[in-house]
């Protein structure tokens, strides 16, 4: 047993360990990893788990609470407050006489720092906890051989979570599996593995139990014949292997360490960054001007400097990251309650922006419960003697690869008829696995008399290319053109009824070889057909209708026969008038392909790479493309799409490639996801437009006040408190509702619209800020230093209330409070902040920061100014919508 951690460290990833695992004889490898040919005991697994930890890759560094707290503290807002605390300490405590020391400002500002930091930390912490919880709801599994503590002989085939694997485990691999750890192959059968995630090469390569001489001294370690690395996936075939590295000790884990935390920026990230930079650019231009104007007109450069810094804080969108995170996190939690798991938070926004959904047919539009309806002879007569069924059963039963839905249907049908004993008279000799180029698979069987035959089933057109004969009425005849035509007519009839048809062929062998290859699939005898029915989901038609109503076009991308795809598509309400097949696409020019993918809704007989290519072509036309699929052949398309959607029962590689996982195969959740994505995006846009327009207007207000007033319009502490209160009022935006009209179509970032919005709406607040200046100057005679605090109190309240009211004005294109009201959290928070803002000048806290109670005659003026502000904003909103055809 492994008693010392130093014995474990040598298992960390390094080239020597990999080469040892590859080159050493099996017995040596078993001894080195202290395991047996039956696997590990449960006790040993527990020990190794405690030493190694879970078998997981940290794609992004987990954020520790202390680090998150530090990041919440390090931001422009807290930075300026900290500077103000230091200055206050120097001016009010250190340089003051003992009797004149004043700690009030220090205590107040320090309280603001603590509140601001905690607010951001809590939101970030909750978002991370939610994301981690959602990730745990989707698990990939593998089959492992383990030696029970009370049994002998092992228990092969136990399904466990990939996280529970430890070095020394023996695992079973089959088509569709993600390689769960770094593995030395000890047994294999036609094992083809895709290493594209590691090497970038799209072609799959074959792996063997033994290392070839050519690989002994040359080549990259990823090319080793008997080593499979975590992150690659099984395309076809099967294998047994011993795990020699897990988690961060794997080859993939080493790569992940170097890139952890450096996720590539998405269009969504870039949009947020553009908004932030736009606001910061305005701030960098205006703040120096404010500093110079105040310094020149007031003569106090230190005060002007502190005021300019405070203005900078007010103009900095410091809450934007928190609002975005809170919105996305809330959207993910809402979707999880609807049986939809979000692996990547940014995918929620893409869900809302999606205007084209490409979907596979089988298991997505259909029920994923295929039934074998008919098994018929070549001449179309029923297979009353079950000869066709028997051959189909052998093919499905003896294959070791991934049994697809049609294999399961055959096995289930034979079980219903009580014919499972058919296989007892035969033994398997070899198999030629399925691949998406040949679109067929073969097994070689031998009966008790030593007679061998190869049995092949696959897509009809591909099967006809390897058949030279056909069996009619028990007699084998050359396969003539008329017979081929008859076969194709029969298939079309079945396809028109929505049935999928496979052809079945066989050939007897005298050879006693034990290894067979694709070259043996020739001169075969066509013996019959299998017709399967996979009816559409009950929810498919309604879901597609609702997606269309919400501006999402649905396209079907299938590897199946064109007639079958059209039949199913018609039943679920998809337009089938324009369609194209994979072979037709191959022969098109790039320009013709581009036109075809835009025009057509039905794509059939596609290869996996063609699915991916179609998505790329659609994206080039500025579409946001989603893809829904659950098979091995869907993995490339899932990765290529803007939002990959799969189901919890999908093969590992499909789940790994997806951004969204549906826990139930109910297409109605797609509509929920689209709407939640648009709500999330809409609420983010609300904050962005509120902040942008408010900040843009405040720049002009501050500049005007700085130029014409003999004193500061507000003290730095006033600006900071006002900014903090406004920020708090925005924290409920993620819980706001969106108007139904906004949710009716896809939404994407538009930086040009944001600039227009700022220019149109921003200056409105400046008009009424200046009106407030005039009221305070002329009506309340705030024209000298003795009335400075009254002036500042008047603008403090008006500025805060107008900023908070704009939340309700901007959140909807309708008339606020009358035609559209905010959610109760938004209403409660905004009006509470407004009440707090009005009360502050009347409190001792207000006095401590230089504010003074306002005369009651001020408030009618305030109401008039705010009402006028709302009316003018609503009028300009209507005009803006009429000119630019949009609001949010």
Residue ranges of model-derived segments:
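Soluble-to-membrane junctions at the N-terminal ends of transmembrane alpha-helices
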Residues: 54-86, 128, 218-227, 258-285, ...
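Helix-interface capping motifs at the ends of transmembrane segments in multi-pass membrane proteins
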Residues: 83-108, 151, 278-316, 329, ...
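Membrane-embedded transport module
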Residues: 290, 294, 321, 330, ...
């Amino acid at each position: 047993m492994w008693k010392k951690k130093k014995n474990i460290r040598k298992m960390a990833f390094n080239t020597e360990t990999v080469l040892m695992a590859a080159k050493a004889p099996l017995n040596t490898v078993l001894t080195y990893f202290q395991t047996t040919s039956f696997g590990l005991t449960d006790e040993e697994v527990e020990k190794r788990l405690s030493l190694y930890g879970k078998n997981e890759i940290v794609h992004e560094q987990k954020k520790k609470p202390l680090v998150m707290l530090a990041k919440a503290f390090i931001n422009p807002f807290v930075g300026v407050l900290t500077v103000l605390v230091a200055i206050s300490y120097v001016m009010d405590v250190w340089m003051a006489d003992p009797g004149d020391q004043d700690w009030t400002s220090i205590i107040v500002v320090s309280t603001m720092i603590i509140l601001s930091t905690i607010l951001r930390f809590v939101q970030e912490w909750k978002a991370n906890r939610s994301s981690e919880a959602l990730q745990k709801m989707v698990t990939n599994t593998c089959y492992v051989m383990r030696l029970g503590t009370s049994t002998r002989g092992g228990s092969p085939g136990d399904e466990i979570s990939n996280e529970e694997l430890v070095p020394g485990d023996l695992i079973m691999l089959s088509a569709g599996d993600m390689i769960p750890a770094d593995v030395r192959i000890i047994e294999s059968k036609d094992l083809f593995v895709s290493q594209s995630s590691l090497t970038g090469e799209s072609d799959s390569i074959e792996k063997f139990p033994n290392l070839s001489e050519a690989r002994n001294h040359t080549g990259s370690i990823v090319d080793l014949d008997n080593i499979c690395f975590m992150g690659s996936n099984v395309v076809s075939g099967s294998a047994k292997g011993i795990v020699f590295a897990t988690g961060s000790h794997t080859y993939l884990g080493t790569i992940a360490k170097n890139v952890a935390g450096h996720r590539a920026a998405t269009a969504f990230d870039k949009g947020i960054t553009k908004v932030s930079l736009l606001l910061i650019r305005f701030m960098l231009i205006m703040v120096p001007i404010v500093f110079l104007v105040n310094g020149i007109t007031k003569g106090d450069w230190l005060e002007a400097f502190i005021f300019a810094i405070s203005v900078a804080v007010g103009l900095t969108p410091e809450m934007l990251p928190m609002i975005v995170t809170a919105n996305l996190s809330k959207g993910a939690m809402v979707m999880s309650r609807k049986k939809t798991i979000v692996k990547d938070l940014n995918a929620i926004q893409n869900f809302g922006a999606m205007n084209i959904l490409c979907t596979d047919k089988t298991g997505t539009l259909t029920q994923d419960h295929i039934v074998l309806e008919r098994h018929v002879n070549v001449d179309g007569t029923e297979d009353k003697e079950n000869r066709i069924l028997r051959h189909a059963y052998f093919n499905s039963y003896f294959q070791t690869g991934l049994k697809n839905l049609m294999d399961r249907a055959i096995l289930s049908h034979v079980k219903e008829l009580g014919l499972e004993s058919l296989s007892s008279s035969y033994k398997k000799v070899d198999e030629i696995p399925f691949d998406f180029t040949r679109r067929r698979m073969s097994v070689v069987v031998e009966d008790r008399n030593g007679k061998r035959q190869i049995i092949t089933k696959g897509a009809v057109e591909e099967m006809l290319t390897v058949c030279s004969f056909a069996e009619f009425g028990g007699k084998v005849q050359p396969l003539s053109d008329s017979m081929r035509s008859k076969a194709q007519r029969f298939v079309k009839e079945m396809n028109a009824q929505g049935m999928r048809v496979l052809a079945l062929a066989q050939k007897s062998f005298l050879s006693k070889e034990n290894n067979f290859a694709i070259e043996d699939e020739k001169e075969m005898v066509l013996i019959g057909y299998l017709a399967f029915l996979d009816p559409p989901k009950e929810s498919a038609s309604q879901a597609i209708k609702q997606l269309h109503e919400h501006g999402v076009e649905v396209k079907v991308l299938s590897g199946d026969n064109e007639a079958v795809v059209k039949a199913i598509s018609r039943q679920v309400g998809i337009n089938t008038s324009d369609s194209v097949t994979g072979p037709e696409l191959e022969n098109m020019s790039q320009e013709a392909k581009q036109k075809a993918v835009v025009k057509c809704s039905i794509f059939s007989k596609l290869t996996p790479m063609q699915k991916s290519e179609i998505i790329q072509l659609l994206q080039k036309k500025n579409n946001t493309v989603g893809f829904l699929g659950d098979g091995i052949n869907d993995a490339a398309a899932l990765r290529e799409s803007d939002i990959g959607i799969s189901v919890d029962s999908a093969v590992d590689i499909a789940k790994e490639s997806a951004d969204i996982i549906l826990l139930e195969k109910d297409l109605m959740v797609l509509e929920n996801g689209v709407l939640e994505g648009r709500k999330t995006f809409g609420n983010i846009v609300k904050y962005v437009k509120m902040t942008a327009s408010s900040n843009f207007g405040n720049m002009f207000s501050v500049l005007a006040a700085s130029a014409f007033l003999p004193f500061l319009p507000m003290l730095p502490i006033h600006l900071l408190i006002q900014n903090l209160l406004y920020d708090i009022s925005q924290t409920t935006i993620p819980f706001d509702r969106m108007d139904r009209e906004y949710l009716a179509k896809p939404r994407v970032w538009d930086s040009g619209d944001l600039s227009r919005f700022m220019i149109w709406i921003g200056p409105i607040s400046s008009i009424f800020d200046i009106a407030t200046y005039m009221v305070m100057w002329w009506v309340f005679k705030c024209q000298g230093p003795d009335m400075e605090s009254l002036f500042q109190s008047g603008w403090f309240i008006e500025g805060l209330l107008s900023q908070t009211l704009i939340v309700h004005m901007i959140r909807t294109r309708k008339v606020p409070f009358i035609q559209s009201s905010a959610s109760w959290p938004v209403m409660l928070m905004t009006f509470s902040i407004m009440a707090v803002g009005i009360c502050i000048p009347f409190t001792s806290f207000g006095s401590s920061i230089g504010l003074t109670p306002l005369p009651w005659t001020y408030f009618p003026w305030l109401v008039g100014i705010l009402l006028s502000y709302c009316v003018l904003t609503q009028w300009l909103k209507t005009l803006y919508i009429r000119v630019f055809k949009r609001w949010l």
